[in-house]
A protein has these predicted regions:
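N-terminal alpha-helical transmembrane segments of multi-pass membrane transport
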Residues: 1-131, 248, 271, 490, ...
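Flexible loop linkers connecting adjacent transmembrane helices
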Residues: 1-4, 37-43, 70-89, 114-137, ...
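Membrane-water interface regions at transmembrane-helix termini and the short interhelical loops
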Residues: 1-6, 32-46, 65-86, 135-142, ...
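Helix-loop-helix connectors at the membrane interface of multi-pass transporters/channels
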Residues: 1-8, 169-185, 211-234, 266-269, ...
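Helix-loop-helix module between adjacent transmembrane segments
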Residues: 5-29, 62-66, 101-105, 139-213, ...
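Loop-to-transmembrane helix boundary motifs in multi-pass membrane proteins
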Residues: 6-21, 181-190, 227-244, 248, ...
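Membrane-interface loop-to-helix entry segments
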Residues: 16, 50, 57, 192, ...
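Extracellular/periplasmic helix-exit of transmembrane alpha-helices
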Residues: 108-122, 166, 274-297, 357-399
């Protein structure tokens, strides 16, 4: 293993990406409050005044995914006809799923229902059964097939250019060649890649900003240590080094094996909470109701902007999530494209949407309803039995991270389960951010053939950049401006993703015409 060998770095993309990120990070450290005020104003404008554009964009992505599954191009293979998949189906599913979760899924999966319980959407009454069902359903909706459809469409566009058109460049800009032509090789293409990379780095700090306090709280609960900023910095540093060493082993030996371990550990923790956490019947029954609520109200939940009631609920939650997924979509698309050679378009889209959604739903169903079951048993003992904990009281008085930790610790064998949960949170962040660092390195690589990976020092470098920026911004309480910047970047990035989709359909139609309609079933 030689970390310093591998494909050459494209300095025209690499250097500006690093420079812009570091410049803005320093600016946010120097002016955290002023930066946040200005960026928040822009963010509010984009979610309140332009939020409807995110709504229509995500629905268009969902419709495109359905077309790719059901339409005439579904059997088209991503690669040559003789190509076999590079990874087993189990490993492929695990690598897709763990790439997008990180610790954010553990965080929101356990606690998001509280926000919707306290401020119900769609006009439901606070504390009512409708509020409870919507509280459980909305998290699953936000992390469900709409988001994964967006990832899938972008991945197919990139994979087609990479595996079918045989362009040895794994970048977002390359997927726009069908529309932009040779301009992709000039400043326009470089700008697309640099812009996407910056937005992604901001999105990663959002995940670290959520996961670090949660993991630190878990360590403190287990060890009795005081929750301090120093301990949080140690957590981020350990994360960063683990991500870097995983990347040094490459895609097959490092990322795949870590993803497999993550899957086994996740289902171990989730399985214990489901079957032995004391709320089995409540979890399965309430999950069933939540799934029904989603399917019954999918169009309402998707299109609701609350223009009359003006609660801002769709803007603060649904639009925010759609913007977050837009920021992550290119990275997920590049990653899924890289690992999907030899699979058909239908397999890739259906696999991403179905298994990704199912995995996310399992986390929300078990973690969220376990937490809700604890709360209902504590506040309504005449109707609910089992382990009890006033989770909302802890949420209000101690904080979100401690509400999550105490919910896990309230299960039987609480210390053991919490230790497993902390390990799961750690590994989930490692697998998620490893994927991001791998993607950033791929985009900065001048030429990346199908059988190649980015130089390992390149991937390791981006892991260090992500960790160093997170530590620096945490020290100076400047994480939020960079996080907000990434969401602001989502609006123009939507335009790029539209170009990507249009370019793909243009290329595949032209190839189909040349082959005399070979894409027909």
């Amino acid at each position: 293993m030689d970390a310093f060998k591998g494909p050459k770095v494209d300095k025209v993309v690499f250097i500006p990406s690093v420079a812009i990120t570091l410049f803005l990070a320093v600016y946010f450290v120097i002016n955290p409050e002023d930066s946040l005020v200005k960026l928040s104003a822009v963010f509010t404008y984009m979610t309140d005044d332009l939020g409807w554009t995110y709504v229509w964009f995500t629905l268009a992505a969902f419709g495109s995914a359905l077309y790719l599954i059901l339409g005439k191009y579904g059997k088209r293979k991503l690669g040559n006809e003789q190509d076999k998949p590079d990874f087993s189906t189990f490993s492929w599913i695990g690598m897709i799923f763990t790439a997008s979760t990180g610790s954010s899924l553990l965080y929101w999966g356990m606690i998001e229902w509280i926000y919707f319980w306290k401020s119900p959407p769609l006009g439901a009454e606070v504390g009512s059964w409708q509020a409870a069902e919507l509280a459980s359903a909305y998290g699953m909706f936000h992390w469900g097939f709409t988001a994964w459809a967006m990832y899938a469409v972008v991945s197919i566009a990139i994979a087609y250019a990479y595996h079918v058109k045989k362009k040895p460049i794994l970048r977002l800009s390359e997927a726009t060649r069908g529309i932009l032509g040779d301009r992709v090789d000039g400043p326009i293409g470089k700008a697309i890649d640099i812009f996407f990379m910056f937005g992604l780095i901001g999105g990663v700090t959002t995940s670290m900003g959520l996961g670090t306090p949660m993991l630190t709280a878990g360590i403190c609960k287990l060890t009795g240590l005081e929750h301090t900023q120093t301990l949080e910095i140690i957590v981020i540093t350990t994360w960063t080094l683990s991500i870097g060493f995983t990347l040094l082993f490459g895609l097959e030996r490092g990322i795949r094996r870590m993803s497999d371990l993550n899957i086994y550990l996740a289902f171990g923790v989730l399985g214990f909470l489901l079957f032995f956490g004391g709320h089995f019947l409540f979890i399965v029954n309430h999950t069933t109701s939540a799934v029904g609520t989603i399917f019954q109200n999918f169009m309402i939940m998707s299109f609701w902007t609350d223009a009359v009631g003006q609660s801002k609920h769709p803007q603060w939650w649904t639009v925010f999530y759609w913007a977050w997924w837009v920021v992550y979509a290119p990275a997920m698309g590049l990653y899924i494209a890289k690992i999907s050679r030899g699979r058909t378009i239908r397999q890739t889209v259906l696999g991403s949407v179905f298994w990704g959604t199912l995995g996310s739903w399992i986390f929300f169903a078990i973690l969220g309803n376990h937490s809700m079951g604890l709360y209902l048993s504590a506040t309504r003992p005449e109707s609910f039995s089992g382990p009890a904990l006033n989770v909302i009281e802890i949420f209000d008085n101690v904080g979100v991270s401690w509400a999550i930790v105490e919910s896990v610790a309230a299960a039987p064998l609480g210390s053991i389960v919490l230790a497993a949960f902390v390990l799961l949170a750690f590994i989930s962040m490692v697998t998620g951010q490893t994927t991001i660092a791998f993607t950033l390195a791929s985009v900065c690589t001048k030429e990346l053939k199908e059988e190649d990976e980015p130089a390992r020092w390149n991937s390791f470098f981006w892991a260090l950049v992500l960790g160093s920026i997170s530590v620096s911004l945490l020290l100076f309480n400047a994480l939020q401006p960079l996080q907000t910047t990434s969401i602001v970047a989502a609006f123009p990035l939507m335009g790029v993703l539209i170009l990507v989709a249009l370019s793909f359909f243009k290329m595949i139609r032209e190839d189909d015409a040349k082959a005399g309609g070979a894409g027909e079933e």
